[in-house]
Amino acid sequence: MKKIGQFIYSWGNGHYTRMMSLNEELPNFIKEYETHYASKDEIYQKLVARFPKQIVHMANAPTPIDGKYGPDVLLSMLNAFIPIRGQKPLISQVVNYLREERRLFDSQKFDLVINDGDMGPNILAKNRNIPSIFVTNQFKPRLWKSRFYFYPGVLFIAKQIAKATKIVVADSPPPYTICEYNLNFPEDIKHKVFYAGHFASGKKKRNSIKSNLEKLIDGHRFGYWMRTGNKSTNDITGKKYEESFSQIKSEKRIISHARNDPTIDVVKDEKGNTYSISDALDKRIDWIQIDVGFLSESEKETVLESCDYTVINGSHTVMGEIIGIHGKPIIGIPVYDEQTNQIQWAEE
């Protein structure tokens, strides 16, 4: 039986979402296989909740240091040389995490390695002559002038990605590539690049019984505001959204927070009064804003089909789903250069 190692970068949820979509397709290509998963933090916890613990492993790939809103650039750069907030210097982190992954490689004897965002396995697989696939939506992203100091890091990352046997772009082939401005592949590696399309499923995931939220929004026109990303990205996205609400006071909106926290679920009317979703439904409240911590698959499907437009930060996974599957117009309020590039491509 073939053994596959899947390594998932823990910065943001898109890497995990793509890999789970890939898992749904793998049986169409490989009949008998065993998969082991590796990540850390919140993604590790999701894997443990979803799969038997004996096939889920800790992989401490370094991640940026969170700031109040987005990664703290200064602290992340200083962390390359000194400990910051309990994180060892970046060089020590890299050495330790490669040592851990090396042990996993040697103990499991993988026949194939699939990585989404985690570049270390590319190096280990190449050194062991194990075929590897790197799933991505960026290689050498176009940086804006304010981010020139990231360029050496971008070149280093591109060099490690290039060590994969195959590079799978989770996007449509040119000229329909949303992440085009984040790729910029050199000629010498284009032979190993494959465009696989967006890892978004067109399967309808609707329950036969409507939830209270689905009943509450039935027949209304509204915009769907999606907060996505890790904690700091989610926070700054939410802050940017809130700055816009004063300009659209009478326009209905649903805000999904991508956090499994039911205390977030609140309905507001135009006077600012708040209600639970069930109370708002019972009292037939003329709502103006609905905040939801986490939408079920059925609720998300209903919201996307019913909304007039979506507001996003430029997350690649989300853009593929909204534009590719649902064909809804988007309004982009990006946080990072990567997201700005994708929003600009869509606008053009």
Task: Please provide the spans of the model-predicted regions.
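Active-site-proximal region of nucleotide-activated glycan assembly enzymes
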Residues: 128-198
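A short, glycine/small-residue-rich beta-strand->loop->alpha-helix junction that serves as a flexible
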Residues: 7-20, 232-236
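Conserved nucleotide-sugar phosphate-binding/catalytic loop shared by glycosyltransferases and other
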Residues: 25-92, 284-286
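A donor-sugar binding/catalytic signature common to diverse glycosyltransferases
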Residues: 113-116, 297-344
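Glycosyltransferases and closely related glycan-assembly transferases
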Residues: 50, 102-113, 120-134, 327-328
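Alpha-helix C-terminal capping/helix-to-coil transition sites in glycosyltransferase folds
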Residues: 109, 163, 305-306
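Donor-nucleotide binding loops and adjacent catalytic segments primarily
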Residues: 201-309, 319, 340
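Conserved nucleotide-sugar donor-binding subdomain of glycosyltransferases
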Residues: 73-115, 119
